[in-house]
Amino acid sequence: MGRCCFYTAGTLSLLLLVTSVTLLVARVFQKAVDQSIEKKIVLRNGTEAFDSWEKPPLPVYTQFYFFNVTNPEEILRGETPRVEEVGPYTYRELRNKANIQFGDNGTTISAVSNKAYVFERDQSVGDPKIDLIRTLNIPVLTVIEWSQVHFLREIIEAMLKAYQQKLFVTHTVDELLWGYKDEILSLIHVFRPDISPYFGLFYEKNGTNDGDYVFLTGEDSYLNFTKIVEWNGKTSLDWWITDKCNMINGTDGDSFHPLITKDEVLYVFPSDFCRSVYITFSDYESVQGLPAFRYKVPAEILANTSDNAGFCIPEGNCLGSGVLNVSICKNGAPIIMSFPHFYQADERFVSAIEGMHPNQEDHETFVDINPLTGIILKAAKRFQINIYVKKLDDFVETGDIRTMVFPVMYLNESVHIDKETASRLKSMINTTLIITNIPYIIMALGVFFGLVFTWLACKGQGSMDEGTADERAPLIRT
């Protein structure tokens, strides 16, 4: 009986160890899990991935912060601007995909991304319909910019003088965000009906969409899940100088493909930024107990380098690191994009304005992604809208203002997975962990039987050494 147990334990140990190593090397269970996820994470009617893509379940909040100008007269005399940050004014975003149509045997899908904003009073510092902000007169600066290359130059100069326009104006937060009827734009509208008489930083962006998209469904490859193929009927942009800079890369930022590795560079096309950007792995995180890869927008995105020379408009006119001139895609308005408080920008942009306090915690853009599913667990998209200003002798409105990139406002668009959704996702992830760890469980059993085998071997050797009383007796007795 003992000898039988001895051989059984040894055989089982050897078989289990060989089996576990074979399964690990062949990645049998890992491949099975990966294939299962690849089949589930695809835009197809009836899949959970499609439902979440069409109507994102997680709440998205956008916080708007404004820079209130406190010394307008001194600025016009050439002194350093002083601004005070006012905010947040928080809005909940209501998002959904509409006009959905499948094409190309289910490998592509077209849609528009609708977005509406609902004010959240309890998460805001005040009432946007009442609170006043003093800032640059962006419509005036825009028409001044138009006058530099526009046939309406003489008309614009005459209108600004006749209507005594000032460089700084005061409006409510609601007006600055969603629009107000501007006097100068209304006059120009008479000559140019295509120019709206209304101005707002997010005018016509509440309850609307940012254009027509064609996405890949991931049917042909999980790596193509929700990648953008076309935007507004174009496969590339036409604003920038080089073909590389005009490429539309990656997703719209609402979703990513599953089975992400930390060595991957992920691409995103945020249409409000007028260009594609990329994010890189930064650190390991845990969100609601779920594992995540933290990806960040690196400083190189807006660095003054040869790789970004194609974004300098006009050609060769690079403003410096940390800022992007997007006037070419904003109807000629002298809008400069940056990160909040000129985070990661050249120091001269920060020191030019009194009231800039850039810091990583509040001003960087990041996204925490569960690498197994590609689901976003937590994210913060942050960018700042600035205006390029300079003194122009032909326009008394500019006074003796310094040439600078002047901050107007910034936003923080954030999302955080809730406990209920996290619990469901955690259950699914734990199940996959059990499956992928089966080879290790088999290996542990192999080690256990190996220990039993060793114990039986030692016990058997001990028994042989001790022997019986007769065996221990001397052969010759006296």
Curated annotation (Swiss-Prot):
GO molecular function, one term: protein homodimerization activity
Consequence recorded when altering I476L: Normal targeting of the protein to lysosomes
Any one of the GO CC terms: focal adhesion
Transmembrane helix keyword on record: yes
Annotated function: Acts as a lysosomal receptor for glucosylceramidase (GBA1) targeting. (Microbial infection) Acts as a receptor for enterovirus 71.
Disease entry from the Swiss-Prot or TrEMBL record: Epilepsy, progressive myoclonic 4, with or without renal failure: A form of progressive myoclonic epilepsy, a clinically and genetically heterogeneous group of disorders defined by the combination of action and reflex myoclonus, other types of epileptic seizures, and progressive neurodegeneration and neurocognitive impairment. EPM4 is an autosomal recessive form associated with renal failure in some cases. Cognitive function is preserved. Genetic variants in SCARB2 can act as modifier of the phenotypic expression and severity of Gaucher disease.
Similarity annotation: Belongs to the CD36 family.
Entry protein name: Lysosome membrane protein 2
